[in-house]
């Protein structure tokens, strides 16, 4: 919670410095938060927490007294405003805390219900073997003690974000890193893989790169650490050298093949997956969104959506072709209707998200539909 407050205060700080000559070169119209580990939690939760009721769900109440664990009258609200001045200092008040996009590396959300339609677009990378921020939905525990029940990692978060339409501005992509992510999903699904809470991985999810490292409990392959540094940090904190050595040894349990080469390779992979989605999601120069939607003359209604048995396409112009892909980019069906309205039997389609490219022979429009 304090991390959410601090992140919002940081956004306000950069907006404030923009008026002071912009020493940090910030484009205040395009602010993205990227976090890994705890930072991923902060970014994902910051994107969704906007109601008092969300931080006062039953699981966030004291089990004995039913008093909220987060008392905004003491600690301030999620913007960092209000509360007891002895416990919360308001920073850079008067500037916007708004952001434009979230990038999450191995983080999770306190409760999936926080995520709602209209939240900012999100992209994620996550190991299905992560034991702290579970890939799907499970309990947050440390040292065997459950802290919070039913937290949700990137697999469930991104599925819901996509289903709500929050990522609609990110088109289907077919670059090498997107294909690699799809192949990883295919490998996990075919192997009957589960996450650290034994949730089955049954479908691929757009805008999520599932990282497969081969280590059974790994959650942060982009990390690098060495014994000399961890010992030095421990001693700087007034702790015995042995405690730093123990921290190093403990980290090897989940990342036994740690190296700079490995860490930077995973960092490069994650950024190469993120960056095209940043460009398209924020409509930066070089985006590909306009390629399929450049001509606004073609208008298509897709209904019902979600669907179970059939999907109809009603176009403002003659439909030459309809090409349907599943959410992994696999070609499912290609049709040549040569009419303005066409209905497709989808009763044999697997449940999930699909993308239809509708062409009138001159322009193409892509529409998303869901099979339940």
Model-identified regions with their sequence ranges:
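Gly/Ser-rich "nucleophile elbow"/oxyanion-hole loop immediately N-terminal to the catalytic nucleophile
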Residues: 1-5, 9-37, 52-57
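Loop/turn elements at helix/coil->beta-strand transitions in domains of secreted/extracellular proteins
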Residues: 27-31, 40, 97-102, 118-122, ...
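Glycine-rich nucleophile elbow surrounding the catalytic serine of serine-hydrolase chemistry
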Residues: 35-45
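Mobile cap/lid helix-loop segments that gate and shape the active-site cleft of serine hydrolases
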Residues: 48-114, 120, 134-152
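Active-site-adjacent alpha-helix of alpha/beta-hydrolase-fold enzymes
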Residues: 120-226
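C-terminal outer-membrane/trafficking sorting elements
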Residues: 294-372
């Amino acid at each position: 919670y304090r991390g959410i407050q601090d992140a919002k205060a940081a956004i306000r700080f950069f907006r404030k410095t923009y008026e002071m000559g912009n020493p940090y070169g910030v484009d205040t119209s395009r602010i993205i938060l990227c976090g890994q580990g705890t930072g991923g939690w902060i970014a994902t939760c910051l994107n969704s927490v906007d109601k008092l009721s969300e931080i006062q769900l039953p699981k966030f109440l004291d089990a004995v007294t039913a008093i909220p664990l987060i008392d905004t009258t003491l600690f301030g609200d999620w913007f960092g405003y209000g509360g007891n001045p002895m416990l919360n200092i308001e920073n850079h008040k008067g500037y916007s805390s708004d952001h434009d996009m979230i990038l999450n590396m191995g983080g999770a959300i306190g409760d999936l219900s926080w995520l709602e339609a209209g939240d900012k677009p999100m992209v994620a990378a996550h190991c299905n073997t992560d034991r702290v921020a579970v890939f799907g939905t499970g309990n947050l525990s440390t040292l065997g003690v459950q802290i919070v029940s039913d937290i949700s990692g990137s697999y469930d978060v991104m599925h819901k974000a996509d289903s709500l339409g929050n990522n609609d501005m990110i088109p289907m992509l077919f670059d090498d890193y997107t294909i690699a992510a799809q192949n990883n999903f295919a490998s996990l699904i075919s192997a009957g893989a589960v996450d650290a809470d034994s949730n089955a991985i049954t479908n691929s999810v757009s805008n999520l790169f599932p990282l497969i490292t081969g280590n059974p409990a790994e959650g942060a392959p982009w990390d690098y650490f060495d014994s000399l540094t961890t010992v030095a940090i421990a001693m700087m904190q007034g702790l015995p050298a042995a405690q730093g050595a123990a921290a190093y040894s403990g980290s090897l349990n989940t990342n036994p093949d740690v190296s700079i080469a490995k860490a930077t390779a995973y960092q490069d992979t994650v950024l190469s997956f993120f960056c095209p989605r940043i460009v398209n999601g924020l409509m930066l120069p070089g985006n590909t969104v306009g390629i399929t939607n450049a001509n606004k003359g073609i208008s298509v209604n897709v209904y019902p959506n979600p669907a179970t048995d059939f999907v109809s396409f009603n176009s403002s112009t003659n439909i030459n072709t309809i090409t349907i892909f599943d959410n992994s980019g696999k070609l499912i069906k290609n049709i040549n209707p040569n009419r303005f309205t066409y209905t497709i039997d989808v009763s044999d389609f697997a449940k999930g998200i699909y993308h239809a490219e509708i062409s009138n022979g001159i322009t193409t429009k892509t529409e998303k539909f869901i099979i339940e």
